[in-house]
Amino acid sequence: MSTEERPPLGKFGKRSLEKYVFPYLDSSNATMTTPRFGSDYNAVALDDEKVLVVSTDPLAISPQLGWERSGRLALQVITTDVAVSGIAPNYLVANWNLPPTTSDETFEKIWRGFTEEARCSEVQIAGGHTGRYEGSSFPTIGAGTAFGVGKKEDLVPQTPSPGDEIFLLNHLGLEASAIFSFYFPERLSDGTSPSIVAEVKQLFDDLRPTSDLCYLSSLPGVRALHDIAEGGLLGGVQETLASEQGQCGARIVRDSVKVDDRVARICSFLDLDPLKITSIGSGIALVSPDRVNEFIRLVEDKDLPVEEIGEVTASNEISIENEDGTETLTGPIRDEFWARLSEFKGNP
């Protein structure tokens, strides 16, 4: 297979999932949700009242981030996908396929960060597997699965409807900016300033997205909730609306999407659009218009950085209102972060 024919890296897109994955699945009566593109989790009925929510993600560990910090981030990536369901993550299992040269002491540092973050998120590690294997290499060295058990009535409906207001739990662009700051501190300090790089690193270390998303999922009027990862905000909006099979669209007002000044400086230096890059710690909430005031009051009581950025529409298009006109999304969002990171690694 030539380089030109190589499949894209990252998550399977909608077409690949629907053609090569979903046709082979057999959903039982106990499965409350059908696997679909854009879904953060799936739910299984345990009885008439209780539900089990599950989600699996890769375990990604980056030496440049620091072993303990990478462990903390890996835990957050896994648990946030359950947190958006309305059921808090309770348990987790992890499969670590370590590179052959990974020492016990190195893994202990990763594990320390992972387990400390689990305690902060009130998640118990129920089991797993740990070993060294030929062919394994950083960053992707396994996978983790989070479980949450709760009442069916607490599940977020995940049913967007025209007129719903779109709110952003706003740490937009922070993950990508922080990763560059840890990987290339000197180059970013030269392009911005040493204080900006240091402050963005600290902002990233202070993130606690699992508890924030659990809180948002419990609020009245929340009709859908989605964490923002690959594809950024705009990719997240696409995934959030995917359940409606083209029956809903969205209008996003770019000027309403506030980006931290320090993050914006780094994104500008890197020529990255904060709306199109991975942003662990951020989330999208769709709120019924008749509950918006109550939602805002409760968010303000918690002092969360949440902003209204648009609304769900009856069209099947996602439009972004910019200063110089309106842009309509015509296809999947290509996360610009990964390409830029590869460029920087290739041009030290």
Residue ranges and their predicted role:
Residues 1-348:
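Helix-biased detector of long, well-ordered alpha-helical tracts
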